[in-house]
Regions:
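N-terminal accessory regions of nucleic-acid-interacting proteins
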Residues: 1-23, 30, 190
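Short, contiguous clusters of charged residues that form electrostatic/catalytic patches at enzyme active sites
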Residues: 2, 86-90, 167, 171
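Metal-dependent phosphoesterase core characteristic of DEDDh/y 3'-5' exonuclease domains
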Residues: 11, 16, 33-42, 46-74, ...
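Short His-Asn-centered micro-motif
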Residues: 21, 82, 104-106
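Short acidic/glycine-rich beta-turn/loop cap or linker motifs at sensory/regulatory domain boundaries
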Residues: 24-27, 49
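Metal-dependent phosphoesterase signature
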Residues: 70-91
Length: 190
C-alpha cells in the first residue's frame, strides 16, 4: 500500500470528525515602530462530511495595521464591525464537537487562535506536512499544492483570503481522501 493510500484510508476513517480551519491576522510588519503582537481577526472552518461552515470576524483589539485589510481581503469597516473575542469563543464552542480533528495548512493560525484563547485542545492534522511527505517537496501555500494534488478548491460562501484559503484546503483534503489513481502508483514517487 502506498503512502498516499495509507493517508486516504486514515482520512476516510476519520472523515466525519474532520474540520478544516483557517485564520487571518491583524499583523504589523516585524520592524514597524507601532508593531503589536498579531491577533486573529478572521476565523473560518468547514466540516466536509456535513458541509457545515463556520465564520467569525473579530474586531481588532489593537490598532488595525495599514496592510491588514488588503492582506485579508476585507474592508476596514467590516473588520472594525466584527464581534468580540468572547463571541468568537462562544460561537466556536457551539460549532465544535468533542471528537473533532482539526485540519490546517501549517500551524501558525491555529497557534495564534489558541493564544487568543480559542479552545483548540483537540487532535489536529497539519495537511502541509502530510502533502510535503507525500510529494517530497515543501509547499508554502495550499493553493500552490493544488495542481500537484490534482485538486480543485471547494466552493464555500466565505469572505476574503480566509474563505479562499479554506476553499483550497477543503479541496486538497477531499482530493487526498480518494485512493491514488493507478498512474500515481506506477510512475510517480508517492
Amino acid at each position: 500500500t502506498s503512502p498516499r493510500d495509507k493517508l486516504a484510508a486514515r482520512l476516510a476513517a476519520s472523515w466525519s470528525r474532520l474540520v478544516c480551519v483557517h485564520g487571518e491576522a491583524n499583523a504589523w510588519p516585524r520592524h514597524h515602530p507601532e508593531r503589536e503582537e498579531p491577533e486573529t481577526v478572521h476565523w473560518v472552518a468547514h466540516r466536509p462530511a456535513t458541509a457545515e461552515t463556520f465564520e467569525a470576524v473579530m474586531a481588532p483589539r489593537q490598532a488595525l495595521a495599514q496592510a491588514t485589510p488588503d492582506h485579508v481581503e476585507m474592508s476596514p469597516e467590516r473588520l472594525r464591525a466584527g464581534g468580540t473575542v468572547q463571541q468568537w469563543r462562544d460561537a466556536w464552542t457551539g460549532f465544535t464537537r468533542p471528537d473533532d480533528i482539526l485540519v490546517m495548512w501549517g500551524a501558525y493560525y491555529r497557534d495564534l487562535a489558541a493564544g487568543d484563547g480559542l479552545p483548540l485542545s483537540v487532535p489536529s492534522i497539519n495537511l502541509r506536512d502530510e502533502v510535503s511527505r507525500l510529494l517530497r517537496r515543501r509547499f508554502g501555500t495550499v493553493e500552490a499544492s493544488m495542481d500537484s494534488l490534482g485538486a480543485k478548491p471547494t466552493l464555500l460562501a466565505l469572505a476574503g483570503r480566509g474563505g479562499r484559503r479554506l476553499s483550497a484546503l477543503v479541496g486538497a483534503l477531499e482530493s487526498l481522501r480518494a485512493p491514488a489513481p493507478p498512474e500515481a502508483t506506477t510512475g510517480r514517487a508517492w
